[in-house]
């Protein structure tokens, strides 16, 4: 006669709970969360924003069916020296950013921390340039401080 797999009974709750725990490891979201894999691989190291220096301005081609050159910048992060690409949101926003400017970047808001819409491989966007909001610069409300 084969033994029972699951414990039965009025006080078997704790044992059942312990038995179910091992199946959590097959869930990829649980595994990534518990082992902190996002923080380990993330250039921002789990932080919401990061400061960096602009290395160069680039134009990235939009994915099909759209046809456009999305303006972006290559940024070297100050805290760890990693280089990432950040999108510059707004009409003519790239004109307000020069090489060697200090920028603050944050996630672009795509699904699962990935890229957004038709911009391939870009997971970050520029928020501030030399401590001034990029949005304000584009609207013309504020000017970039002269060095």
From Swiss-Prot:
GO cellular component term of the entry, any: small ribosomal subunit
Single Gene Ontology BP term? translation
The keyword RNA-binding appears for this protein:
yes
Q: Does the keyword Ribonucleoprotein apply?
A: yes
Pfam families reported in the protein's UniProt record? Ribosom_S12_S23 (PF00164)
Q: Which GO terms describe its molecular function?
A: rRNA binding; structural constituent of ribosome
Among CDD domains, the record links this protein to: Ribosomal_S23
Which InterPro entries does this UniProt record tie to the protein? NA-bd_OB-fold, Ribosomal_uS12, Ribosomal_uS12_arc, Ribosomal_uS12_bac, Ribosomal_uS12_euk/arc
Q: Which Gene3D superfamilies match?
A: Nucleic acid-binding proteins
Tell me the superkingdom of the source.
Archaea
Sorted alphabetically, the keyword list is: Ribonucleoprotein, Ribosomal protein, RNA-binding, rRNA-binding
Task: Say what the protein does.
Answer: With S4 and S5 plays an important role in translational accuracy. Located at the interface of the 30S and 50S subunits.
Assigned protein family: Belongs to the universal ribosomal protein uS12 family.
How it assembles, according to the record, is: Part of the 30S ribosomal subunit.
**What name does the UniProt record give this protein?**
Small ribosomal subunit protein uS12
